[in-house]
Amino acid sequence: MKKVNKKTVGSVGEKIAAQYLSKKGYKILEKNFKCKIGEIDLIALYKNQIVFVEVKTRTSVNFGLPSEAVDFHKQQKIVKIAQVYIASSNFKQYQPRFDIIEVYLNPEKLTLEKVNHILNAF
């Protein structure tokens, strides 16, 4: 089995997650939003909510589920970044929501095997 680049796996997963959300009726506002605190993979509007999405992509579950990588520290960081985004945007009236999307890829071809969307993950 060939070794796959983590950055490539991550970017493939984020692209798949954005397409998945778009098909479900979400309007993608930002991809890889960055500020001094860090980065949020996807920011989207859905009905009356502004949704902040952490995408975790894996080619194997040998080291645990993708969502397990979003620990309390990571969650707190995402919340702080979301606060920065909301404060500097026109979306203050929207209810914030924090989701995780797990993307499972075939380790050989990096093709989609499964998407698991965890709503209100934290």
Curated annotation (Swiss-Prot):
Pfam families: UPF0102. CDD domains: PoNe_Nuclease (cd20736). One of its GO terms (molecular function) is nucleic acid binding. It comes from the Bacteria. Belongs to the UPF0102 family. This is UPF0102 protein TTE1452.
